[in-house]
């Protein structure tokens, strides 16, 4: 049994589950015996219910130009409140929200932004939402505009961002990371400046991310992503994860959570053309036999060349066979249903190969 919530007159398929994460026996969840009474008690507690009504309910416009009431999902409620509480405490200056794609991170930022703007003890803060693509900028701006969030501005160019920061504007600012290109250190040293970075696994370890941090040395920095990276040259956990947070993140909503809540469709993988898969074990054996009589230096050079899997992936024979299989599969299973399909290739050259084939 599960508890679902939704606004009045919302079709049942758009209702979402309300859960208490990490507050019950996981076996009970698996068996479908979770404590619905406990969830109802939590949801209808005056502090929770009033919080949702005041900060986590918005009116938006649907595709038919009709006003609809939108109520938060539980992961948006928990994630946004985690950000708000961290800012109010003021001790930890960053945090990572790791929520799977399609789980509603744009609305999470909206809920967090409007709640922080209304907290008197935060002293009229500035909330910045930073994206790294024009389409994301337009998408998030449209989300805020549709919900008629007050005191929200966007930046059309670098100068506008500079003016907003230098004049100490106290609003919700939506901007792109690229507009920090010409900022200078200590551009705004205020403490109650909160930055939420969408798709936080990109651009943050490079020059633009460093420029932003240098320009806003005392700001709170929160990263939101569905795919954090943990590599030497790119590390989302280093950029946003706080040492105090378990596993480096302050809130997580996984792919499995999203499937369970019907927020995301399941992903099915069908292996095809096994003769064209990479047999690493036999490849390693063949390489050792071939390299036996080579010097160490020549062996290293050969290894570097052999490691370039693109040579194999882009061989004309392989591309031709795969394209033939794609066309047959598309015409038989995809096109009759009126759907489209996408081909993912190793690089641009391969993309041209597949298109021409």
Language-model-detected regions and their locations in the chain:
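Conserved helicase ATPase motor motifs in RecA-like P-loop NTPase domains
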Residues: 101, 201-202, 215-232
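Conserved helicase motor
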Residues: 131-134, 154-163, 177-182, 346-348
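Residues immediately C-terminal
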Residues: 136, 179, 199-203, 229-230, ...
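Conserved motor-coupling elements within RecA-like helicase/translocase cores
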Residues: 158-173, 186-187
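SF2 helicase catalytic motif II
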Residues: 188-220
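Interdomain helical connector at the RecA1-RecA2 junction of SF1/SF2 helicase-like NTPases
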Residues: 234-338, 355-356
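Conserved helicase motor "Helicase C" RecA-like lobe of SF1/SF2 P-loop NTPases
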Residues: 348-357
């Amino acid at each position: 049994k599960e508890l679902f919530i939704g606004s009045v007159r919302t079709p049942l398929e758009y209702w979402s589950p309300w859960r208490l994460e990490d507050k019950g026996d996981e076996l009970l969840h698996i068996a479908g015996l979770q404590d619905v009474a406990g969830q109802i008690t939590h949801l209808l507690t005056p502090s929770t219910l009033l919080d949702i009504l005041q900060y986590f309910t918005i009116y938006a416009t649907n595709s038919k130009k009709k006003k609809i009431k939108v109520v938060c999902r539980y992961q948006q409620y928990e994630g946004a409140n985690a950000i708000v509480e961290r800012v109010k405490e003021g001790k930890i200056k960053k945090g990572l929200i790791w929520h799977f794609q399609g789980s509603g991170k744009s609305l999470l930022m909206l809920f967090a932004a409007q709640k922080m703007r209304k907290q008197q003890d935060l002293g009229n803060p500035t909330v910045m939402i930073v994206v790294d693509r024009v389409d994301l900028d337009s998408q998030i701006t449209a989300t805020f505009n549709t919900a008629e969030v007050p005191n929200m501005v966007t930046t059309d160019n670098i100068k506008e961002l500079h003016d907003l920061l230098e004049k100490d504007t106290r609003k919700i600012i939506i901007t792109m990371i690229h507009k920090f290109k010409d900022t200078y250190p200590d551009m705004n040293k205020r403490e109650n400046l909160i930055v939420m970075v969408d798709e936080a696994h990109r651009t943050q370890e490079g020059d633009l991310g460093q420029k932003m941090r240098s320009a806003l040395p005392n700001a709170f920095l929160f990263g939101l992503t569905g795919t954090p990276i943990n590599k030497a040259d790119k590390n989302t956990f280093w950029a946003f994860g706080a040492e105090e947070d378990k596993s480096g993140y302050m809130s997580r909503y996984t792919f499995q959570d999203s499937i369970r809540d019907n927020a995301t469709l399941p992903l099915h993988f069908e292996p095809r053309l096994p003769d064209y898969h990479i047999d690493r074990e036999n490849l390693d054996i063949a390489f050792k036999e071939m390299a036996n009589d080579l010097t160490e230096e020549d062996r290293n050079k050969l290894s570097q060349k052999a490691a370039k899997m693109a040579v194999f992936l882009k061989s004309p024979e392989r591309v031709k066979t795969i394209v033939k299989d794609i066309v047959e599969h598309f015409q038989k299973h995809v096109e009759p249903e009126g759907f489209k399909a996408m081909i993912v290739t190793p690089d641009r050259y391969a993309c041209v190969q597949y298109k021409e084939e």
